[in-house]
Amino acid sequence: MLGNLKKIFDKNEIEIRKARKIVERINQLDEKARKTSFEEMKSYILQYKGKLENIEELDEHLEQVFAYVRETARRTVGMRHFDVQLIGGIVLHKGKIAEMKTGEGKTLVATAPIVLNSLMNRNIHVVTVNDYLAKRDAMWMGPIYLALGLRVGIINTTGKAYEVVWKNPELAEKGLKENYCVWPDDYDGEFLSDEMKVKKAVEAFEVDIIEVSKKEAYRCDVTYGTNSEFGFDYLRDNLVVSLDDKVQMGHFYAIVDEVDSILIDEARTPLIISGPSKNNASVYKHFYQIAKRLEKDKHFKVDEEHRTVLLTDEGIEYLEKLLGVDNLYDPANVNSIYHITNSLKAIHLFKKDVDYIVHNGQVLIVDEFTGRVLPGRRYSGGLHQAIEAKEGVPIKEESITYATITYQNYFRMYEKLAGMTGTAKTEEQEFKAIYGMDVVVIPTHKPMIRIDHDDLIYRSVEEKYKAIVEEIKKRHEKGQPVLVGTTSIEKSEKLSEMLKKEGIPHQVLNAKYHEKEAQIVAQAGQKGMVTIATNMAGRGTDIKLGPGVKELGGLLIIGTERHESRRIDNQLRGRSGRQGDPGESIFFLSVEDDLMRIFGGDRIQKVMDMVKIEPGQPIYHPLLTKLIEQVQKKVEGINFSVRKYLLELDSVLDTQRRAIYGYRDNILERDVDDFISEAIDNFVEARIEEFCSGVEWDWEGLKNSFAVIKDFVKIDTKIDDKEKLKQDIIEQITKAYRLKKEEFGEDFEHVAKFIVLRIIDENWRQYLEEVEHVKESIRLRSYGQKDPVLEFKKETYDMFNDMMMRTYELSVSYLLNLRRVDNKAEEESKKELAKVSTVHDEFRLIAEESKDSDKKKPKLKIKR
């Protein structure tokens, strides 16, 4: 074990040593860079931009580009990369994860590898967790990019897009020409306060944003945006009917900020483009009432560990009587099982003010990792409707899926993927296994002096909360600021009530008060401030210490229980002790906490029985501390297995998705002829194999199978050779297709593309719907000791082939039966597509679970 640890640290140390040598060479270029004009630095970038033949050539320019970026940052934004920030940049350039502590300046770190990789003249994506950070970071770092001749775009979840530009172009041009510098010549310190910045340079290099089309934002050198919007744009690009409507420029290089949050915490959350379904709201109410009549452990079992519900034999019999059916698991009754299990989950596994809140008559999901409300997101598969029935709020229509992809498979499309976070090392195995990314721990610029105390463990939740209140009271009396981290809204409000009774002034930050987040966080480090927060205080915020707080020991972090992941605990601790500041952290635990109760079980209780201690006193026992860590590792392992399992399922779909999207791209970029030729071949071959195998050929069956195009195919029953018969039919259909093209002339291409793309999309949509039912059924089969992934592969393979055959047949028959009519078929299709919306599916159990073209096209009608 020790040997393995040593190996890990050695590996990290080797990586850092290599990077330090490169940084030493960059530092040697520093003096020369100081004397280089803006124009010369920009010329260097533009000289090589688009001229490199392969990505490996970038390394030849790394030192010079990094030196120029550092100097440009010093002059335009008054920030100079520390050596450790350059090390972080080197790690990002290599397609790895840079683990950097809070306050180490990750935003600035990304600039050097972005400018370097821009030499490939391909769009680079910087991925953030929310719109605010995307806009802030793009504008904050914008002057660096603009000064070096790069364009900066921003996309956000409202569908709007922007480009960063100089606020006063004439003044900026003057500043660049005369080499203005925000950093004063006579200042050699490390940090530059706003008061010390050279005013004329600050004014010259101020930026603004202008609204542009999303397509234009993607044509910039670097585009900042959220993970969900990048993913949705990819899906929307694969629903368009015109190449001009595509916005993305491929997937070359992405730098993911808060990479653990996006690639791990959200990995169970597929992106889905959906539209409304036809399920009636009364159905959900009906099954909710039935579910309330079922008794736990008698009619069903609840598995909290895996967050699922399983009907018992007695429960199945009871439901069969109640619903008046002979066999609940008959395919005809699959919807009943689906509604019952969703209702049971809504009642027993999804808790108000923990998993969701009810606000203005709506059920709003709360992100379990950040504590933030996720507006617009809904659980899929009818689960959200089941919760709405439980809460007695209006039930919204269930949705049907048009396109979907997991974050895992979306981000694996990038040729080079890198990430930054304060907490990644504990998940290194997963990053490597799923994304092929190594984690490199970057040294801090200043030593970390925060004190992390041992856990205090209590027998009951009540004892724990009393101890927390006492600790807060003691620290508050001396003026030390305290940030208390809770795991749910419910618990944050309970603690708030206790503090009110004690007369301790405090502020609460949870999903209900998220509008005040920036204001609350800004005050959290001030003297005497007490802040209670859910996980949402853990990311994208910087807590600065107020006057006199360092002398009091800095910010105290109190954790009220351990999270399922050690990484989330580390994020909470990381709010204190930034940039060498003093600070403390301590966790108060109870053996009744959810994590201990669900996963620790008897082992923790046995240790408790061994320890004799007075009520209200904390327990110190090395075995107990070790057990808690084992419990967290166990849960991390379970969650990793779930994510890996989901990836295996989605990877089957991913191959099929790429095939479908490949067909679409070929049709959009070229013409429809190749696809139709393939469709005719496959369609005819399948019919020949079906009806002309064996001794007796089924001529009648063969004729009927071509009924939809009977006007164009005459079956010659005199041909007794299968291959000749096939070729004869193919030639007849191909000739009919050629004549149809001639009839329509130049209009045909637009019409044919539109029809075939819509057929592909509709069949793919139906296929995705069927796949969801397969996922549900194989989850049940997994209880019967069958490998669910293997079962899934088998079933979807045949289903996909059937779907493709339907697509081929429909494409051929629709095009051959085309005739000119002045109607609004296409406009109706567009109206239907306009109903399509984007949702974000929670997809827990297995895990639980377009854009219109602006071009005018010829009118058409399908004759069948």
UniProtKB/Swiss-Prot annotation:
It holds the Pfam family SecA_PP_bind. InterPro entries: Helicase_ATP-bd, Helicase_C-like, P-loop_NTPase, SecA, SecA_CS, SecA_DEAD, SecA_motor_DEAD, SecA_preprotein_X-link_dom. The keyword ATP-binding applies. It catalyses: ATP + H2O + cellular proteinSide 1 = ADP + phosphate + cellular proteinSide 2. One of its GO terms (cellular component) is cytosol. Part of the Sec protein translocase complex. Interacts with the SecYEG preprotein conducting channel. Has a central role in coupling the hydrolysis of ATP to the transfer of proteins into and across the cell membrane, serving as an ATP-driven molecular motor driving the stepwise translocation of polypeptide chains across the membrane. Belongs to the SecA family. Monomer and homodimer. Part of the essential Sec protein translocation apparatus which comprises SecA, SecYEG and auxiliary proteins SecDF. Other proteins may also be involved. This is Protein translocase subunit SecA. The gene is secA.
